[in-house]
Amino acid sequence: SGLFLFVLCEAIAVCDLVAVSVLSGNRNFVGRISPDVRANYLASPPLVEAYALAGSMDIDISKAPIAQTPEGKDVYLKDIWPSQSEIAELVEQTVTREAFIEKYADVFKGDDKWREVETSEGEVYDWPPASTYVQNPPYFRGMGKEPGTIENVENARVLALLGDMVTTDHISPAGSFKETTPAGQYLIERQVPVREFNSYGSRRGNHEVMMRGTFAIFRSKNEMLDGVEGGYSLGPDGQQTSIFDASMAWQERGVPLVVIGGAQYGAGSSRDWAAKGTALLGVKAVIAESFERIHRSNLVGMGVIPFEFTCGDTRTSLGLKGDETVSISGLDTIEPQQEVPCTIVMGDGEVKEITLKCRIDTAIEVEYVEHGGVLHYVLRNLAATPMAAE
């Protein structure tokens, strides 16, 4: 995984090729292996090697040769596939008690590089200002001593209008990214060479990178824009821009944001950054036809309120285009799974009144959102304990 040679990337783009990967891990999301790879197939490690030798997925490796010897003799999968006895013999030779004892004897000491890491002494972490891997996140910035009430969403603009089965990998990709992306530009501005970009996942400790990567997967489609793929939206001036830049522009104007989706919003792995990034982009609510269970919970944990359409309404049936303003009321006295009124002012001025179901599902989740999220809830409770007071 990672970056390809430029000539390969150029050929894929110019010829509109569907590049393919074969991997033995369980992360076969679009763009996870590389932004230039669309199709990803899962296989056992030996099959990964076999397809690497074949150099193509357009082959029946159970019948066709996968390679040739220097003498031109065809090599078939059966010729290189190990027998059960060979596997058993190798396991017996290498998987030993002594090997585990040796590897785990100093597991908590780390290797030489880990022991050479310089650390500062003190009760709190000394955040390195120049680090592009770890930065102090703004979750507690401006936090008061007491929680507030849940505020209504008033005249929010749509940041993204998405379809069905938007996964957490679409929302917060973990793979590599290019220099043309907002995250890439952020690193270039800090003199990080492209070859050292690494991946979103490796830079999850830097919110500046991760919020720029939210909704930025190159194959995603924001239905606000016709025929455009990637993490783009419309800014306050109505012009196409990155979702990150649009978010920052709206936030500078004090305008709240919403994301609108289809069915099974947030499917896939339980990626915390899919909720963190959404919150940092200034999104106050996500309105969808249905939610994946864990992502719904994570949104609530970050103070972002999930809502579901009711009465058969969808983004399509309502004719939403992304140029609407959205207001949701009744949140200051919200109860778990309560239905609340929503006013949508269409781009042409038409007003539509609909009902949404609030997917804050439990009383404790109401408290989380009142606090601004579960992190604020925990911190305030810790600060209120006798031990903290001492």
Predicted segments, located by residue:
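Fe-S-dependent hydro-lyases/dehydratases of central metabolism
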Residues: 1-390
